[in-house]
């Protein structure tokens, strides 16, 4: 599986490319194995920071409350769902996994539940948060490692970071960060 590019790292890459005379830019996208290929890409001339882009033609996205088929409002986080001709028909010889992943919604269409958290804005841009399985639950709160990593990575002394959950007998999990400092710090 993949993960999103942090806003800070994206800025660093774009600056590096520009400083070295490149005329290209980093363009984030999104795709799943179950959807054959990428299904969403950041338009070349319309970038929204933190977005993974807009859906390809004939590919539809919606965000639902986790564990349901209920759509959430714009800019509210939920599970990313996809629908369209490039979505798989099912997993080979695995009816249970197929039933857990492909679900018929009240709109009559079958939607792929990606297992990813994200949101959609009013312009149809998609924002990936992280894998649902990567979420850390500590003292009853949902903590998203990618959000903590973005904050840590924004510090001038930090080269990169990785945040994980570690078991805790009282809090269920505790947040643990691994940090690589820049040279000289």
Annotate the PLM regions.
Residues 1-49, 60:
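Gly/Ser/Thr-rich phosphate-binding loop
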Residues 2, 31, 53, 116, ...:
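Active-site glycine-centered loops adjacent to acidic/histidine catalytic or metal-binding residues
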Residues 39-41, 53, 72-76, 89-93:
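Active-site glycine/GP-rich loop and adjacent strand/helix microenvironment
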Residues 50-55, 108-110:
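Short Gly/Pro-enriched turn/cap motifs at secondary-structure boundaries
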Residues 62-81, 104, 120-123:
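Conserved beta-loop-beta connector loops within the AMP-binding
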Residues 84, 89-90, 100, 117-185:
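AMP-binding/adenylate-forming catalytic core of the ANL superfamily
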